[in-house]
Every structure is written in structure tokens, then in C-alpha cells.
UniProtKB/Swiss-Prot annotation:
It comes from Methylocella silvestris (strain DSM 15510 / CIP 108128 / LMG 27833 / NCIMB 13906 / BL2). This is Aspartate--tRNA(Asp/Asn) ligase. It holds the Pfam family tRNA-synt_2. The lineage of its organism: Bacteria, Pseudomonadati, Pseudomonadota, Alphaproteobacteria, Hyphomicrobiales. L-aspartate binds at E175, R221, H455, R524. The record marks H33, G83 as: Important for tRNA non-discrimination. It is an enzyme of class 6 (ligase).
Amino acid sequence: MHRYRSHTCGDLRETDALQPTRLSGWCHRIRDHGGVLFIDLRDHYGITQCVVDPDSGAFPLAEKLRSEWVVRIDGLVRQRPAGTENIEMPTGLIEVYVTEIEVLGAAAELPLPVFGDQNYPEDMRLRYRFLDLRREKLHNNIMLRGRVIDSLRARMKGQGFFEFQTPILTASSPEGARDFLVPSRLHPGKFYALPQAPQQFKQLLMTAGFDRYFQIAPCFRDEDLRADRSLEFYQLDIEMSFVTQEDIFATVEPVLRGVFEEFGEGFAVTPEFPRIPYAETMLKYGTDKPDLRNPLVIVDVTEEFSREDVSFNAFKNVIKQGGVVRAIPAPGAGAQPRSFFDKLNDWARGEGAAGLGYVIFEGDAGALVGKGPIAKFLPADVQQAIAAKAGLKSGDAVFFACDRPDRAAKLAGAARLRIGSELKLSKTGVFELCWIVDFPMYEWNEDEKRIDFSHNPFSMPNCNLEQFLALETGVREEIVGIDRGERNRDLNESNELRKRILEITAFQYDVVCNGFELSSGAIRNHRPDIMRKAFALAGYDETVLEQKFGGMYRAFHYGAPPHGGIAPGVDRIVMLLAGEENLREIVAFPMNQRGEDLLLGAPSNVTAKQLRELSIKLNLPEK
């Protein structure tokens, strides 16, 4: 017989009755019933009940066992007595009559239990993560993660993709977040960077003539942490040559749909992902990450509130300054108590808004009458128009967000989610996926009074490329000044030129599931002339391309194919499939909210010798 086990703790069944067995594992629970000891022995595969009678030679040692001791148990498999079966356990129809016990590893007193719901402080759980990982739920989450990654790999290879590995030590580049820097001992004063994504490498592989790339890629970003964001994460990195945006969608949809169907435990999955333009999702849902389980749709009622006979000046004054009014329907909210409306209003103030105006509708179809604080400022036909536009009927209510467009969208989007939650309107047991398309190529930075990229600077403009290049003709001074400040002053004086630039969209897309962004992607800008032009419109000259992205920029001068890609986040996919709200529940050894590894003590101090070897002196901030 094997030194440690003939079976796992999840193997034994009725058909094994009367057979000898050897098991090894952890003492999950130990119970004393009338002098008979019951040991629930646990390993990676399951739990088996072991019984030690007082007349067994193993009984004296069994009395000394404690929770989480690691033991080897020899015994005889037998059916459980009638009435003691546990049909909830795969091994619940048998038990092992113990004849011998060997202690393989004793355990000190546990700082936290390893079964049941965990309500211990997160820092304690992370400090003793090796114990936390013994809990069934967390253990299963980590196993789910592995199976999801296996499935993603198989699905990509099934579509003819080849798996690559790209460098971990690379050059620092401005990709939206701070880099993690690694000092070079061989090149004093110089630094490597950990990759925020293998972006340039995968595009270089396409330029090198490879066709279908994928990688389960580790990524590192020195950014502020939150529940769905981590300093290090993994993504299913994908790139393809000679493809259109629709080719990317046709490739990725079966992969994501298949994984959510395979591991979603019966949840319905969107059969075909709808394409929603960025401008539309910002209007209808107030966000570029819409949760489509929520049926509420925001509508614009700026025109209705702008009429001469509307006397609600609080909104009209904002409209005159370029603001908008967004209406968020609340079906059936008329039956809610006054406190429902007051709480929403208080919540809006807590979000930095002036509040949420509202109207409650009563009456018959076609003759609805508005009630509430601002209804008296709205003529009857305006009330009817708002009700019709928002799809309201008697007993429904509508809330209003009024501010400049970006702030109104944000408030209305948050209110939509809150109202949907309060009224329990959202669907459950579903994964609602969609594509967000036609992102703006550029945005206006009001604080710095300048145009900049809104998303990925290497995306192909979604417009007539000849006209895009022609923007340079006759307006070069406005577009490419001596420095960004000069160019921005010129743009500030040329509102028409600025408007034309800000109207340009890009072949950029996001895939969203239940309000979480799973991935961003794009058709890449593979032409150096268009790349120079795109950067020039944002105030960057060619030296920026050469200095920051020189490897890729030079490569594109030697025949680059049209290509595009995407990179769904593995961690967020697993988080959704596991029904968790925090990434730390699906990562084996995560850091805490402060970016600390409490188990191994990272980040840590290093010795003066190590710093000297790296030619580094510390300049610490004053405490």
C-alpha cells in the first residue's frame, strides 16, 4: 500500500465497503459521541468520516488529535448505520473504521477557523492566507480559476491561436497608469518596467508575420486599489492580423459566451452581444459600463425643460450654461412612501449633486397628472411629453438629474442603478454581455484647456482617413505648434477645428458584463503617417513616438499588417463566475487594499548593500 494513501478523501463509495483503505489529510472536525470519536478527514478532494471506537488500538492517539492536525489513517470501509447517512456528501453513505493513526503534522492553536462563513478582518485572513485557503468556498474559487484558464486556453487553440510569452522586464511607457520600476544593476541609473500589458510586443509579433497570438498575460499597474482592481492581474491577451472589428467580435464572443455557459451554473448568457455606441450608452445608462440586467433607460428631457412656459428656473439656468436634464424612470415608485424619495434625494446630495427632482404620475393613460415638488412648475402638456418619452404610466415616478453633460450622465447612471436596486427591478441569474463601440478618439481636458487622447492612442481612427490626414493641410499651425501650450491656445481660438477633432471616433471597443468592464480592445493604427497625425492632433510631435514607442514605431515602417486585438480580464471573469464582489476572493495570494502582502511582508526594506549595488540612494518623504 502507498506510504500515505490508497484513496483520497473524496473517493470512497458503497462499492468499497469491507475494503481496507489508507487516507491522509487534515482533521476537519472531531466529535465525541458517547465515547466514540468521529473524525471528519479532509483533503483537496473531499471529506470522509472516520470512526474510532474505544477498543481500537488507535483510540489513545485519536484522543490527542486537534483541529487541522495532518494525519494518516488506516481502516476498513463500511456502510454507515441506517439513519446516519449524509446524502449531501459524496462519501456520505460510508465511513472508515479506524485501526491505525499516524500524526504527520501537528497544528498550533488556529488564529482563525477554516470552515464556515468567514467574518474575520481581511488583514488577518491575508496574514494567514494558507489557512484561509483551506476554507471550502475560497478553495473552490481558486480551483474554478484554474479551470476557467484551462477552458480559455482550449477555446483559443481551437480557433487556431498560438500561445506566446512576452518579456516581463521591459521599457517604461506611458500607458495610462504608473509603471512598477525595476532598477538595473548592470546599467546604473536606468530602470526596467514591469509591463502594464504586452501591448507593443503583441503588435510587434503581428508585424513579424505571426497571425493569431494569445497569452494568459501577467500585467502590473501601480494604481489606486479597489474591489475590482489589483496591482497585478492576468488577462487573456489576444491579437490578430488582417482583421476588422467584426472579426474580433466574431472570435471573442464564442470564447466568452462558452466560458460563462460552462461555469455559470445555469445562468442565462446573452446569445448575441449587442453593439451599443458610446454616445448611446452614456445617454441611456449614464456609463460606458452598463449593467443591462437593470431595465431602466435614461432619456434626455432638456428640450422639455427649456420651453418658455416651464418655470423651474433651477434647471433652466443650468441649461442656459450648457447643461442638460436627464430623466430616470422609476416604474411603480408611486406606491413608495415619502421616505423613499427623501432618501434618494439625500443620496444624490451625498454624491455632490444639488439633489434629484422628481414627479409622480397619477391618472389615466393620455391624461396623466404629475405630483411632487417640481410638478407645479411643469405645464400639463410638458408632463405628458416627459411621461411619453420615459414610457411612464399611472403609479410610476421619474427622477431628474440636471448638470453639465458629463456630470448629469454620471449622476443619472448612478441613480438608475440605485433605483433599480431599491425597486428590485434587475434580472437575476443572468450574465448580460454587450459591446461598447465608437469611443471618441479625443477628449477636451477642461482643467488644462487641451485636447488629449480619450482612450488608446494606438487605435485606428474610425473615419475617412484621407480627410483625417487632410486636417493637417492649411491648419498645421493650429494642430502642431512649437509646444503643446501654443497648439492648445490655437485650438482654443479655433472652436470649429476643435469640434471637428473631438467628433472623431476610433475603432475602440469594450466588452461589458453585468456592469463590469471585462476588456478593452481596438483595431490598431498600423500606418506611421496616420500615427504621426493622430499624435499631432493631441499635441505630440514625432519625437514622442520615437522616444516612448520607438521599437513599435520603427517596425511599422517595414510593412505592418492591419491588425487588432483585445484582452479580457481573467480575474474579473472568475470573480463574476464565482459570484464574488472582490478580486481578493478569487486570487490565491492577493495584496490588501494598501498594496501589502501581509503573508510574506512585501513591500519590504532592503539592505544598504543591496542599494549600493543598484547605485540607489533613498529620498524618503517626511512623516
